[in-house]
């Protein structure tokens, strides 16, 4: 009994990382071991919806948008503590986030770099200073309409999002070199 399994196509960015970028980084930083070459671990996309404390239906729009953008259902973030000034109670939904790993992560980054970021009006590049000291990079987008998965007519309100790219790099310079090689458009100082 033989079964034929179709090999899924490798994401374009992952193929480029394996074929070209790993070799470039190995030469640039002259690692002694191939396991020291920095790679991507995960991408976390977070959408905070502070207004959901007053109107709990707003979280549904954020979940719908994030599902369309990332291709997987996000987890709803709930308030840890009650804060009277914000009329916030413990356990109220205040946002949603999703963690992308594997092929979904590579496909999301490919869409982000080749389709979404070029659609931003007056885009001058990402800030190269937003690394955390360990090679991880976080940046914010102030509207979801730049993703082509979102139907412009069905947007109920403009929502921003935070995107964190977690790498195995140990320093900011290694992380910056990895992300620049992947095609992240950093501003030149």
UniProtKB/Swiss-Prot annotation:
Keywords: Ribonucleoprotein, Ribosomal protein, RNA-binding, rRNA-binding, tRNA-binding. It comes from the Bacteria. The keyword Oxidoreductase does not apply. Part of the 50S ribosomal subunit; part of the 5S rRNA/L5/L18/L25 subcomplex. Contacts the 5S rRNA and the P site tRNA. Forms a bridge to the 30S subunit in the 70S ribosome. This is Large ribosomal subunit protein uL5. This is one of the proteins that bind and probably mediate the attachment of the 5S RNA into the large ribosomal subunit, where it forms part of the central protuberance. In the 70S ribosome it contacts protein S13 of the 30S subunit (bridge B1b), connecting the 2 subunits; this bridge is implicated in subunit movement. Contacts the P site tRNA; the 5S rRNA and some of its associated proteins might help stabilize positioning of ribosome-bound tRNAs. One of its GO terms (cellular component) is ribonucleoprotein complex. GO terms for molecular function: rRNA binding; structural constituent of ribosome; tRNA binding. NCBIfam families: PRK00010.1 (NF000585). The keyword Iron does not apply. SUPFAM superfamilies: RL5-like. Belongs to the universal ribosomal protein uL5 family. GO terms for biological process: translation. It comes from Kineococcus radiotolerans (strain ATCC BAA-149 / DSM 14245 / SRS30216). It holds the Pfam family Ribosomal_L5_C.
């Amino acid at each position: 009994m033989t079964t034929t399994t179709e090999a899924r196509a490798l994401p374009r960015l992952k193929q480029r990382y394996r074929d070209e970028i790993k070799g470039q980084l190995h030469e640039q930083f002259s690692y002694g071991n191939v396991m020291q070459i920095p790679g991507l671990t995960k991408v976390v996309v977070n959408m905070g919806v502070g207004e959901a404390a007053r109107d709990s239906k707003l979280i549904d729009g954020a979940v719908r948008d994030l599902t369309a953008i990332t291709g997987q259902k996000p987890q709803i973030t709930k308030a840890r503590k009650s804060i009277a000034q914000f009329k916030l109670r413990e356990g109220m939904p205040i946002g949603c986030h999703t963690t992308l790993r594997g092929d979904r992560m590579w496909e999301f980054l490919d869409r982000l770099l080749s389709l979404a970021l070029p659609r931003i009006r007056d885009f001058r590049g990402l800030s190269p200073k937003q690394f955390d000291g360990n090679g991880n990079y976080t940046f914010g987008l102030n509207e979801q309409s730049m993703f082509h998965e979102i139907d412009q007519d069905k947007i109920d309100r403009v929502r921003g999002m935070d995107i964190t790219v977690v790498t195995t790099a140990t320093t900011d310079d290694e992380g910056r070199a990895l992300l620049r090689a992947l095609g992240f458009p950093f501003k030149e100082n």
